[in-house]
């Protein structure tokens, strides 16, 4: 075990006097203050971890998988042409404010999200429209049956319903609070909203009127603790019961420390470098491949990330086992081959690059440490990258506007709910920043576009899988990204906390959590 992180923690702890939470309360150290508790507004995993304890959707992910399973809908049928989905709703369900959950409430939610003329529309940004843009109509058949009519077959529809964007809010509460609803949420989940003290906490309480198995603990408190070392100190001092997204060094140290438990699980996450395919050295695919061969992925995963991530290849995370190509492997570390390709492309050993990297951010692992290691690997073959780092929101503004005229490569991470999401948003020719997409490197291969569209519309999973594997092989051959790995999400808790589980969705369900007295 390395001592340095613990020395820092002990120095911090010398000034800590946090009172331990009571036995009926679970305190979670989050990475940031939530933006909103309205599922039609927020897009951050940090906020999702709170939302999934307050709300439910028609569909949820089956525990331990990314497979759609019944939620507030007990069953559903799909028309033969894939254009109509009819859901049977669970009877007797009420929102936390006492209003009934029924088909009219479902229609209100989706019309609020999709229709610009809805009186409570305009609550949030992309990706809300993307997830459900194929909905042409929402029809109430009776109080417990609702039908969605789509404009075209859309295979990810059920998976998107299970995502937090599909969580259902109380129409009564929305009408009462209007644009302020995000700070006064009301769902149907096992916990109800109690209060939100800015920069201090969000508090939830067990909902005694819950329609399912009641939560096993009385209260949840989510505290924003932005500094990871402070999260460690709070955990050590007993001020919090569990902490999320600790540094690789601290996770490694906690694995062997008595009195604590470490939960880790790989999910649908990718960390990669976006390459500027429009201009500069990386417009040549040989240079892109050379850069990939220059990077020592094993050293990044084991030495820098301390095994908090696993190797990945291609644009489809391996968490989607049915869609990912098991034969696709990362490039080996081969500096000699990299130098040969660079010479073939006429690239000298004094080539300068601009590498953009955030100082932090959801799913970004250890971006500065990774960038420094990558910088050294690239320099070993004559590619000299100048690192420029930014605060997360400033970084997104830079990268999402496109790399042309700004940089040669940039670090990025995505967590997705379906194999469709990342290719559609970030690899299509029509997904350039100028067109509202996230293809910041301007990669374009019409054959990939065709496969993305065919996969979206194929309702037969085996056919979808064939399309995803074909497009993954094309993308890997073109090398518009250098894919490094998939994050093993981590949670460190005190040993007295039981009933915790990590899901491949990265969501944190706490209704089964308990604390030993």
Predicted regions and their residues:
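Long beta-strand-rich cores associated with HINT superfamily self-processing modules
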Residues: 491-517
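Extracytoplasmic/peripheral linker and loop segments enriched in polar/acidic and small residues
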Residues: 17, 380-397, 424-494, 517
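N-terminal lobe/hinge region of extracytoplasmic solute-binding protein
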Residues: 30-80, 111, 118, 184-188
């Amino acid at each position: 075990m390395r001592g340095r992180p613990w020395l820092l923690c002990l120095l911090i702890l010398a000034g800590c006097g946090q009172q331990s939470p009571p036995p009926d309360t679970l305190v979670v150290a989050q990475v940031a203050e939530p933006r909103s508790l309205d599922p039609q507004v927020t897009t951050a995993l940090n906020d999702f971890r709170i939302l999934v304890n307050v709300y439910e959707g028609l569909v949820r992910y089956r525990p331990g998988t990314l497979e759609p399973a019944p939620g507030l809908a007990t069953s559903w049928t799909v028309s033969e042409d894939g254009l109509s989905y009819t859901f049977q709703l669970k009877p007797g369900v009420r929102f936390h404010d006492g209003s009934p959950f029924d088909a009219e409430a479902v229609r209100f939610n989706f019309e609020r999200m999709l229709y610009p003329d809805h009186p409570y529309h305009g609550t949030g940004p992309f990706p809300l429209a993307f997830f459900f843009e194929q909905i042409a109509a929402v029809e109430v058949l009776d109080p417990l049956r609702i039908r969605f009519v789509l404009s075209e077959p859309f295979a990810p529809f059920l998976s998107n319903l299970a995502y937090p964007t599909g969580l259902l809010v109380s129409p009564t509460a929305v009408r009462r609070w209007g644009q302020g609803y995000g700070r006064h949420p009301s769902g149907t989940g096992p916990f109800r909203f109690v209060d939100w003290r800015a920069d201090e906490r969000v508090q939830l309480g067990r909902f005694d009127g819950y329609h399912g198995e009641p939560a096993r603990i009385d209260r949840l408190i989510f505290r924003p603790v932005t500094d990871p070392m402070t999260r460690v100190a709070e955990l050590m001092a007993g001020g919090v019961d569990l902490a999320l997204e600790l540094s690789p060094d601290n996770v490694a140290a906690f694995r062997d420390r008595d009195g604590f438990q470490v939960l880790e699980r790989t999910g649908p996450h990718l960390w990669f470098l976006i390459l500027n395919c429009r201009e500069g050295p990386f417009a040549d695919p040989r240079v892109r491949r050379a850069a990939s061969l220059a990077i020592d992925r094993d050293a990044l995963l084991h030495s820098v990330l301390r095994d908090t991530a696993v190797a990945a290849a291609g644009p489809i995370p391996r968490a989607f086992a049915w869609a990912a190509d098991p034969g696709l492997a990362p490039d080996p570390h081969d500096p000699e081959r990299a130098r040969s390709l660079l010479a073939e492309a006429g690239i000298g050993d004094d080539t300068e690059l601009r590498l953009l990297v955030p100082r932090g951010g959801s799913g970004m692992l250890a971006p500065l440490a990774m960038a420094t290691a990558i910088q050294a690997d690239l320099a070993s073959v004559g590619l000299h990258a100048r690192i420029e780092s930014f605060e997360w929101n400033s970084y997104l503004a830079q990268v999402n506007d496109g790399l042309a005229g700004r940089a040669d490569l940039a670090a990025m991470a995505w967590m997705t709910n379906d194999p469709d999401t990342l290719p559609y948003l970030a690899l299509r020719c029509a997904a350039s920043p100028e067109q509202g997409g996230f293809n910041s490197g301007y990669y374009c291969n019409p054959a990939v576009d065709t496969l993305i569209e065919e996969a979206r519309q194929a309702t037969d999973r085996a056919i979808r899988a064939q399309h995803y594997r074909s497009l993954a092989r094309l993308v890997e051959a073109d090398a518009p990204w250098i894919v490094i790995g998939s994050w093993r999400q981590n949670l460190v808790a005190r040993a007295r906390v039981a009933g915790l589980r990590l899901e491949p969705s990265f969501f944190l369900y706490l209704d089964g959590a308990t604390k030993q007295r």
